[in-house]
Amino acid sequence: MKRAVVVFSGGQDSTTCLVQALQQYDEVHCVTFDYGQRHRAEIDVARELALKLGARAHKVLDVTLLNELAVSSLTRDSIPVPDYEPEADGIPNTFVPGRNILFLTLAAIYAYQVKAEAVITGVCETDFSGYPDCRDEFVKALNHAVSLGMAKHIRFETPLMWIDKAETWALADYYGKLDLVRNETLTCYNGIKGDGCGHCAACNLRANGLNHYLADKPTVMAAMKQKTGLK
C-alpha cells in the first residue's frame, strides 16, 4: 500500500497537493501545525477539508514553542502584516524562521510511524516569496539529512515547486476542485477564508494567479501539464 503524509495548512497550495495525493496514493494522512499563528483560523479550515476530501487521518500538532522563538508578523499581533509590495527586496516580515525545517522534520517522523513513503509539501520556488525555506535546494538538503538521521528514505515531494500560481489553479481545475480551492481554503495572512483580505502578499499572489488562469485557461493548463507530466 502506498502511503503519503501531506503538510496541510488548509490553504490553496497544500489543498491542491492533498487533492493530487489522494489520486496518487492509497492512503493519505494530513499533518497541520498549531504554532500560535495570527491566521489560526486555518487550523479549523484544514480539519474541515481533510475530512471532506477523504484523508485517512488528520493530526494537529502543537508546536507553540515556535511562536516563542520565531518573531514574525505571523506570530506577533504587535507586528502588522504588510500590504503587498511586488518590488520589495529582502526577506518579508511574514517569514517564520525555522518553520519549514520543523514542519518537514515532524511530518517525516509521523511518516516513519505510519509507514508512509513520502512527505508532500506545497512550497514553490517559481513565485518566490522571499522565504529561504521554500527553495528546492533547502528541501533536498533537509530530505537528505532526515533520511540519514532515520536510516530510512522518506521522500520529500514538492509537486508545486516549478509551477507558478496560475498553473497551481490549473492543477486544482485538472482534478475538478477549482471551486473548492477558491471558496473553501484559507491562504490569507489575516485569516480570512476564500478571497481573503485582498491586501496581503498571500492574497495578491493568489488573486493574480487566478486572474491569469481564468483569462487564458487553455494556455495555462497546457503549460501546467507540460511541467508536471500530466496528460
Curated annotation (Swiss-Prot):
It catalyses: 7-carboxy-7-deazaguanine + NH4(+) + ATP = 7-cyano-7-deazaguanine + ADP + phosphate + H2O + H(+). Binds 1 zinc ion per subunit. GO terms for molecular function: ATP binding; ligase activity, forming carbon-nitrogen bonds; zinc ion binding. It is an enzyme of class 6 (ligase). GO terms for biological process: queuosine biosynthetic process. ATP binds at F8, S9, G10, G11, Q12, D13, S14, T15, T16, C17, L18. Its cofactor is Zn(2+). Pfam families: QueC. PANTHER family: 7-CYANO-7-DEAZAGUANINE SYNTHASE. Catalyzes the ATP-dependent conversion of 7-carboxy-7-deazaguanine (CDG) to 7-cyano-7-deazaguanine (preQ(0)). HAMAP family: QueC (MF_01633). This is 7-cyano-7-deazaguanine synthase. It comes from Shigella dysenteriae serotype 1 (strain Sd197).
